[in-house]
Structures are given as C-alpha cells and as structure tokens.
Amino acid sequence: MNCLMLIFVVFLLAFGVECKKDDYPVDTAKRNCMLDCNVWDDEGYCDKFCKGRKADSGYCYKLKAACYCYGLPDDSPTKTSGRCNPNVR
C-alpha cells in the first residue's frame, strides 16, 4: 500500500497538476490594474477577454465595473492587494 501511494505521489510530481483560479484579471502584473468593463454590456466583452486568457468563462462584475474570470490558469496575472499603477509600463 505504501508503495502504491509513493508511485501516485511521484506520478503527480512528474506530470504536474494544472490548477485554476477565479479572480480579477489585470493587464500586467506590474500595473496591477483591473480590466474595466461596461456594466450594461451583456457580459460578452469580459467572457471573450477571459477566454482569450484561457479561462473557462468571465463576466462584468457590476459593483466594481471590472471583469471577473472563472478558471484562469495559475500563471495568469490577477489583482493583488495594492493600488493600480497606470503609469508603469
């Protein structure tokens, strides 16, 4: 039984595990600015943007007027605590 568990752990480490996250996408990690959206859009813009970032889906979160994505890859930049820095290139 222990041998089987060891093989399973080695298999996971060897082939990796793809994790996904739900969060606000940002244009670049350095700028940390959420993507604005039109709250009257029928969620088409954000869904297309999120799918372009390889997410499962997305919508315009109306209270923040920002796109929110479901199922983003782990390496996709998302909003962190801190302010937006629009002047950073």
Curated annotation (Swiss-Prot):
InterPro entries: LCN-type_CS_alpha_beta_dom (IPR044062), Scorpion_toxin-like (IPR003614), Scorpion_toxin-like_sf (IPR036574), Scorpion_toxinL (IPR018218), Scorpion_toxinL/defensin (IPR002061)
Subcellular location: Secreted
Keyword Signal: yes
A GO term for molecular function: sodium channel inhibitor activity
Signal peptide interval: 1-19
Any single biological process term in GO: defense response
Superkingdom per UniProt: Eukaryota
Main localization of the protein described in the UniProt heading: secreted
Record-annotated disulphide pairs: 33-84, 37-60, 46-67, 50-69
Keyword Glycoprotein carried by entry: no
Alphabetical list of Pfam families matching this protein: Toxin_3
GO cellular component: extracellular region
Domain LCN-type CS-alpha/beta: 21-85
Sorted UniProt keywords: Disulfide bond, Ion channel impairing toxin, Neurotoxin, Secreted, Signal, Toxin, Voltage-gated sodium channel impairing toxin
Tissue specificity field: Expressed by the venom gland.
Family: Belongs to the long (4 C-C) scorpion toxin superfamily. Sodium channel inhibitor family.
Record's comment describing the protein's domains: Has the structural arrangement of an alpha-helix connected to antiparallel beta-sheets by disulfide bonds (CS-alpha/beta).
Function: Inhibits voltage-gated sodium channels (Nav).
UniProt-recorded name of the protein: Toxin To14
Species, as recorded: Tityus obscurus
